[in-house]
A protein has these predicted regions:
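Amide-donor transfer/coupling interface in amidating biosynthetic enzymes
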Residues: 10-14, 48-148
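Cysteine-nucleophile active-site neighborhood
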Residues: 1-63
């Protein structure tokens, strides 16, 4: 808001430009964030960012398996059981909305990949997720190149 970039981002997304967020960047794609208060986000995807309600250690730091909700272009070239690296204390809610592409289990289903149309978010860090993360990023690049 401070740099008046939100209208520019909104215009680019409306124009069909591919837009991706990682970790906090994914969280910014949703409607509200409750980390340290209540904040309006970009609203490109439905849902809110809420704290974990689990007996497990928070922040969630470590490797978890992605569980895709169906066939998706991001799966191309991935192993049968792809693991990715997470570092976060908040997550997208609800976990069962149609924009959730893949989840990970951390005492609850945690949305790990969300997206629709030209908007995509990774809650985990693909750049820290070894060959699986590299493959996911390669798939994103191929998708964007194909779509123009």
């Amino acid at each position: 808001k401070k740099f008046e970039l939100i209208p520019v981002l909104e215009e680019q997304v409306r124009a069909g430009k591919f837009f991706m967020g990682v970790c906090l960047g994914m969280q910014a794609l949703f409607e509200k964030d409750y980390e340290g208060g209540e904040y309006d986000c970009l609203g490109f995807l439905p849902g809110d960012i809420v704290p974990f309600r689990t007996a497990l250690k928070v922040p969630h730091m470590g490797w978890n398996e992605l569980e895709f909700r169906g066939s998706h272009w991001l799966q191309k070239g991935l192993p049968a059981h792809p693991y990715v690296y997470f570092v976060h204390s908040y997550h997208k809610s609800p976990a069962d909305s149609p924009d959730v592409i893949a989840t990970a289990d951390y005492g609850q289903a945690v949305p790990a990949i969300c997206g629709r149309d030209n908007v995509l978010g990774f809650q985990f860090h693909p750049e820290k997720s070894g060959p699986v993360g590299a493959r996911l990023l390669q798939n994103v690049i191929a998708y964007v190149q194909e779509k123009g």
